[in-house]
Curated annotation (Swiss-Prot):
InterPro entries, per the entry: Glycosyl_transferase_4 (IPR000715), PNAcMuramoyl-5peptid_Trfase (IPR003524), PNAcMuramoyl-5peptid_Trfase_CS (IPR018480)
Cofactors demanded by this protein: Mg(2+)
Localization of this protein: Cell membrane
Similarity remark: Belongs to the glycosyltransferase 4 family. MraY subfamily.
Keywords: Cell cycle, Cell division, Cell membrane, Cell shape, Cell wall biogenesis/degradation, Magnesium, Membrane, Metal-binding, Peptidoglycan synthesis, Transferase, Transmembrane, Transmembrane helix
Protein name: Phospho-N-acetylmuramoyl-pentapeptide-transferase
Membrane-spanning residues: 9-29, 55-75, 79-99, 115-135, 155-175, 196-216, 253-273, 312-332
Membrane disposition: Multi-pass membrane protein
Gene Ontology process terms (BP): cell division; cell wall organization; peptidoglycan biosynthetic process; regulation of cell shape
Protein biosynthesis as UniProt keyword: no
Length: 332
């Protein structure tokens, strides 16, 4: 285990430095292409200065994760599936970014197109896992050892979803991917939160005997850590949908392959709080004509409440650390 933990640490370090190397090579290229970010005029006024900052920086993260994962030498089917999910979702995001910032069509992919593509990838992932995993259509329920009885209702530690497995997994994957996308609204927020969540899965995978997934998650951790060098405030580059969808795909794939889909809303609580704030805002406005938050997603609400952008980011990082510690308790 000592050697394995060292290898995981080496992977994080390698991912970090590969990102540091790729950044200065790719960012100037993105600037030449003039793939600048468009900032919402109704958003916080401080964000207007971000207009023109290169986006599609997620290519840096994806490239770093690929190189780092393969250099570790622990290549198996799980690794290929995790990488496939990350690249597939990253490609969907890239197409969306390309249409918006290169072809200058502000809408990008239409909502139904983006959702359809995401569902297709998620279905493949769900079918693969249900057929390959020894657990079949079972998932692990956090905080339950053996079984938990609540009155006349018993919750098993290994919950068999049966025919509901595939739609459930598709929902988790698509929800995670889009929640990460909504989280990517402040400098360093999505990359910082994701490096913490990825580190959680790397440690868990190592302890549970999934070495290739541990290496993959460690590669994501190191790559996100390196990306913060360019994405922390004031950001030199944004990851765009290319990066946020890829990271959402990576996190959800590792969780699905380890049969711990139910832990994602816990450790990724920030992701889902961001998504929930948008849903509640829309529902409230349509039903009552009033808004619950000053602005959604949630991070903008805190900005408009007087918090500095960096404070929001750091607080959300801290919350994620706490949530990951709670997640560890729920699975050990």
């Amino acid at each position: 285990m000592i050697l394995e933990h060292k290898q995981m640490i080496y992977t994080i370090i390698i991912g970090f430095f590969i990102t540091l190397i790729l950044g200065p090579l790719i960012i100037p290229f993105l600037k030449k292409l003039k793939v600048g970010q468009t900032v919402r005029e109704e958003g916080p006024r401080s964000h207007l200065q971000k207009t023109g900052t290169p986006t599609i920086g997620g290519l840096i993260i994806i490239a770093s994760v690929l190189v780092t994962s393969f250099t570790a030498g622990l290549i198996n089917q799980d690794l290929w599936v995790a990488i496939g999910a990350m690249v597939a979702f990253g490609l969907i995001g890239f197409i969306d970014d390309f249409i918006k910032v290169v072809l200058k069509r502000s809408l990008g992919l239409r909502a139904y197109q983006k959702m359809s593509l995401q569902i297709i990838v998620a279905v493949f992932l769900a079918i693969y896992q249900s057929n390959i995993s020894v657990m079949g259509t079972k998932i692990i329920v956090p905080f339950v050892k053996g079984s938990l009885t609540l009155g006349s209702f018993t919750i098993p530690q290994y919950l068999d979803l049966g025919i509901l497995y595939i739609p459930f997994i598709v929902f988790v994957v698509v929800a995670t991917v889009n929640s990460v996308n909504l989280t990517d609204g402040l400098d360093g927020l999505a990359s910082g939160v994701t490096l913490i969540v990825a580190a959680f899965f790397s440690i868990l995978a190592m302890e549970w005997g999934y070495p290739s997934l541990a290496i993959f998650a460690a590669a994501v951790t190191g790559s996100c850590l390196g990306f913060l060098r360019f994405n922390s405030h004031p950001a030199q580059v944004f990851m765009g949908d290319t990066g946020s969808l890829a990271l959402g795909g990576a996190i959800s794939a590792v969780a699905i392959l380890m049969n711990v889909a139910l832990i994602v809303p816990i450790v990724g609580g920030i992701y889902f709080a961001e998504a929930l704030s948008v849903i509640l805002q829309v529902i409230s406005f349509k039903l009552t004509g009033k808004r619950i938050f000053k602005m959604s997603p949630l991070h903008h609400h805190y900005e408009l409440s007087g918090w500095a952008e960096t404070k929001v980011v750091i607080v959300f990082w801290i919350v994620t650390v706490i949530l990951c510690l709670i997640g560890m308790l729920g699975l050990n």
